[in-house]
Design a protein with these regions (language model features):
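Helix-loop-helix hairpin linking two adjacent transmembrane segments in secondary transporters
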Residues: 104, 142-167
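Cytosolic juxtamembrane N-terminal segment immediately preceding the first transmembrane helix
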Residues: 1-26
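Small-residue-rich transmembrane alpha-helices and their cytosolic helix-loop interfaces
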Residues: 23, 55, 59, 140-148
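Residue-level signature of mid-helix packing/kink "hotspots" within the transmembrane helices
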Residues: 31, 59-67, 151-152
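Conserved MFS/SLC helix-loop-helix module at the cytosolic interface between two early adjacent transmembrane helices
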Residues: 64-103
Length: 167
């Protein structure tokens, strides 16, 4: 039989991985996408400035998503809101693969950012729900390490994905 301390460590590790992946959704929408910018530009037949707007729209969405979904998760529950926005994120990401008009693509990138920002704020709020004081500080530091590793690997993953498939 596992001790309480072992169960707590196992729970904390699973929570760290889960929330680490959640906090990485926002940066992943940018970092995995960057290697494909020249290909996206060619496919849309757009200027460099127009394609750079896809990053701007995503960043604006990331910022606004935190302001929108933080209070919503406080009011309606973290899990309900997180699951809803993850579903939206996945659907929007799938739709963006089939879009051939830049204005619609910009809209989808904004929604990706919005939902990515929502997941980030919910992940951090969830950590605050589970921990406090020094334990929270240690957990958030570990969360940032996971997020940092994912952020470093994302452009590599994006480049690799681009080498075997299209954007």
């Amino acid at each position: 039989m596992q001790s309480t301390k072992t169960k707590t460590k196992h729970f904390s590790f699973l929570l760290l991985i889960t929330l680490g992946v959640m906090t990485a959704f926002g940066p992943l929408t940018i970092d995995m996408y960057v290697p494909s910018l020249p290909k996206v530009q060619g496919d849309f037949g757009s200027t460099t400035s127009e394609i750079q707007l896809t990053l701007s729209f995503t960043m604006i969405g990331l910022a606004l998503g935190q302001f929108i979904f933080g209070p919503l998760s406080d009011a309606f529950g973290r899990k309900r809101i997180a699951v809803s926005i993850l579903i939206i994120f996945i659907l929007v990401s799938g739709l963006s693969m089939f879009v051939d008009q830049l204005p619609l693509f910009l809209t989808l990138r904004f929604i990706q950012g919005l939902t990515g920002g929502g997941v980030i704020v919910i992940a951090k709020a969830s950590a605050g729900d589970k921990f406090s004081g020094n334990a929270l500080a240690k957990f958030l530091a570990s969360l940032m390490v996971v997020n940092g590793i994912i952020t470093i690997l994302a452009p590599l993953a994006g480049g690799l994905a681009l080498s075997v498939a299209t954007w």
